[in-house]
Amino acid sequence: MIKSRTAIKRLSPAHTSAKGGGILQAFLKKYPWSILAAGAAIQILTGVPSAWGVFQKAVCETYELAEADAAMIFSFVICFFGIGCILGGLLQDKAGPRAAGLSGAVLLGGGFCMAGWLVPAGIPWAFYLAFSVPVGLGCAFLYPSVMSCAQKWYAEKKGLATGVIGGAVGLSGAVLTWLGRFLIARVGIRGAFLWLGALMFAVCAAACALLENPQGKAAAAAAQGAAQNYTVGQMLKTKQYWLLFFVVALATPAVLLFSPIIVELAQQRGLSEAAALSCIVVGSAASAAGRLLMPWLSDKIGRRYTDMLLFAALAGLSIWFAFAQGWLVIAVYSLLTFCYSGEAAVIPAAVTDLFGQKNAGVNYGFAALGMSLGSVGFPLAARFLGLEAGRHWLAVGAAAAGLVCLVFLKPTQGKRL
C-alpha cells in the first residue's frame, strides 16, 4: 500500500510539475543566458511598429484604405500596446511570465492571420479590430513578460538584460522589413500576413517555454533591488509616476509620427524607393544600438541623466529633421530612432528602480499608458495643426517638455535614479 501511494504521488500532476520546474530552474541557473536568448528570439519578431512602413503601401492598395486610415492602424497598435502592458503585467504577476507570454503569442499570431484572412477591403475599423487590437495586446503581453523575467535573473545587471532584449526589439524592424518585402513580392500582403502570423506564433510560443521566474537565491537577489516594492495604488499616488508617465508620452512624436510614412517622406525629399526603404533598415539598426547601449550607459550614470541627454538630442534632431533632404533624411531619422529607442529601453529599469521589482510587470504597464496617450493624441493633434509642419513642431515641443519633466523627476527612496 505504501509503495502504491508513493507511485501515485510520483505520477501526480503537482509532483511532475514541481519536478519539471526543478529541472528548468537548474538549467536556467546554470545557463542564465538562455533567458536572454529566448527573450531575444521573441522580441526580434515583435517590432511591428518599426516595420510598419514596409506594409503601409500594400495595405492601402489591397485593403482600399486612405493613407491616414492606414497610419491609424499603426497608432492603434501602439495604443493597445500600452493598455496591454497593464493586462499582461497583471497576468504575469498572477500566473507567471510563461502564461502571459503564451497568451501574447496567440494574440500576435492571431492578429496577423485575421488581417490576412478575414478583413474585407474598404473598412478601416475592421482592420483596427482584427489587427491593431490583438497585435498591440500580443506585443504588450510578450514585452514585459520577457523584460521582467530577464531583469529578475540579472538583478544586479538590469541594464545588460534590458539592453539585450531591447536590442532584439530594435533589430526586429529590419528583420520584419526583409520578411515583409520577401513575402509581399511572392504571395501579396494577405499571404504575407498569414505566413508572418504563423511564424510569430511558432517562434514565440516555443521560446516562452523557457520563461520562468527565479527561485531560491536568485529570487532573493532579485528582491533586493529596492527598499520598498510599490503596489499600483501606491505608485499612482506618487509624483514620480505621473512625471514618468508624461516622459513616456512626450517621447512618442519624435519617431512614431514619422514611422508609418517614412518611406513616402524620404521619396518626397529626393530619395529613390529603394533608398527610401533603407530608412527602415538603417533606422532599425540604430534602434537596436540605442536599446543595447543606453541601458548600459544608464547603469553607469543613472537612468535620469541618460534620458535627459536623449530628450535634449531628440529636440535638436527633430528641428534638423524638419529641413533634412536626400540622404540626410536617413541619417537624421536613424539618429532619432537611436535616441527614442534608447530612451524607451531605459524606462523598464527606471520603473524598477523607482517602484521595486515585485510588481514591476504591472507597474511598467501603467507607465506604458503614456505611450497609448501619445500614439493616438499626437497624430490627432498633427492632423489639426496640418500634417506636414504639425508633425515636426509637435516632436520638437514634446521633446523639450519631456526634458523638463525629467529635471523634476527625483528618486522615491533616497537612491540615485
Task: Name each model feature, range by range.
Residues 84-97, 291-302:
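Helix-to-loop junctions at the C-terminal end of transmembrane segments
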Residues 281-287, 292-293, 298-350:
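C-terminal transmembrane helical hairpin of 12-TM major facilitator-type secondary transporters
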Residues 106-120, 313-325:
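C-terminal ends and interior cores of transmembrane alpha-helices
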Residues 141-154, 161-162, 342-355:
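Intracellular juxtamembrane helix-capping segments at the cytosolic ends
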Residues 213-230, 417:
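Flexible cytoplasmic inter-helical loops of multi-pass small-molecule transporters
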Residues 52-59, 239-289, 294:
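Extracytoplasmic gate region of multi-pass secondary transporters
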Residues 168-212:
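Helix-loop-helix hairpin linking two adjacent transmembrane segments in secondary transporters
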Residues 124-140, 249, 328-341:
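Hydrophobic core of transmembrane alpha-helices in multi-pass small-molecule transporters
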